[in-house]
Design a protein with these regions (language model features):
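Extended amphipathic alpha-helical interaction segments
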Residues: 98, 102-182, 199, 214-215
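Bacterial N-terminal signal peptides that target proteins for export
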Residues: 2-11
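Core hydrophobic alpha-helical transmembrane segments of single-pass membrane proteins
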Residues: 15-16
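C-terminal motif of bacterial Sec signal peptides marking the signal peptidase cleavage site
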Residues: 19-24
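Long amphipathic all-alpha helical oligomerization modules
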Residues: 30-40, 155-224
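Immediate post-signal-peptide N-terminus of mature secreted/exported proteins
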Residues: 26-90
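Long amphipathic alpha-helices with heptad-repeat character
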Residues: 42-56, 85-88, 92-106, 143, ...
């Protein structure tokens, strides 16, 4: 009887241990998945930002080529410029969507983190988790601040190059090109400063990814 009783205790202990392990692994896996999703959204937004800047460079080049005085191939250059303007506008809209998705994922990730954190009974673990979450939240908050300034500058630039495109579609003559040259030069100047405006956004995004990688933040959210 004693042997059976001991055997029953061993089996029960093993079953409880297995259940705890499965629950812990599931929680841990979910945390890592959310961390991976969050990092991926930031990477997508950063890649989109860099691609948009490259497209702005292409638009700058085609506009600069278009306003050269006394040129013969005006029609083809205008078509190239128009195509670049449309690409830039399309990429700017996609960038805005990517940044919105990134911020939504970040909010969900931190909310899930905080929810799990409240279940911790170990005060030192709860405190450590709270500090890591606060560090990530601080990094996240810098992205929308920097993004707003860049987005405003990009939208202003797009407005300029689109108005130039519209005017030249009405008057693609040497005189017409000459008349929009001051506006084009302003657009070129503003476009040239976009990279400087984008730099804080890129820095903020890279800080987020650095914080995500530091000390296994995904594991912390998952309850490790």
């Amino acid at each position: 009887m004693k042997v059976k009783a001991r055997f029953g205790i061993i089996v029960t202990t093993l079953l409880l241990g297995t259940t705890a392990c499965l629950n812990g692994c599931a929680t841990m896996g979910m945390g890592k998945t959310e961390a991976t999703k969050t990092t991926a959204k930031v990477e997508t937004a950063e890649t989109g930002l860099k691609q948009t800047l490259a497209q702005v460079d292409a638009t700058q080049a085609s506009l600069n080529s278009l306003i050269e005085p006394s040129q013969a191939d005006v029609k083809n250059k205008f078509e190239a410029y128009s195509a670049d303007v449309e690409k830039t506008e399309k990429m700017a809209k996609q960038l805005e969507k990517d940044q919105a998705k990134m911020q939504e994922q970040q909010r969900e990730y931190l909310a899930e983190w905080e929810k799990k954190e409240r279940t911790y009974t170990d005060p030192s673990l709860r405190e450590a988790s709270g500090q890591r979450r606060a560090a990530l939240n601080s990094a996240y908050s810098e992205v929308p601040k920097a993004s707003t300034q860049f987005q405003d500058a990009l939208n202003g630039y797009l407005s300029q190059v689109k108005q130039i495109q519209t005017q030249l579609s009405l008057d693609l003559t040497n005189k017409g090109i000459e008349s929009i040259t001051p506006a084009a030069q302003k657009a070129l100047s503003d476009g040239g400063r976009l990279k400087d405006t984008a730099e804080p956004v890129i820095t903020a995004m890279e800080r987020v990814m650095s914080e995500m990688a530091r000390e296994g933040s995904g594991a912390a959210a998952g309850g490790q």
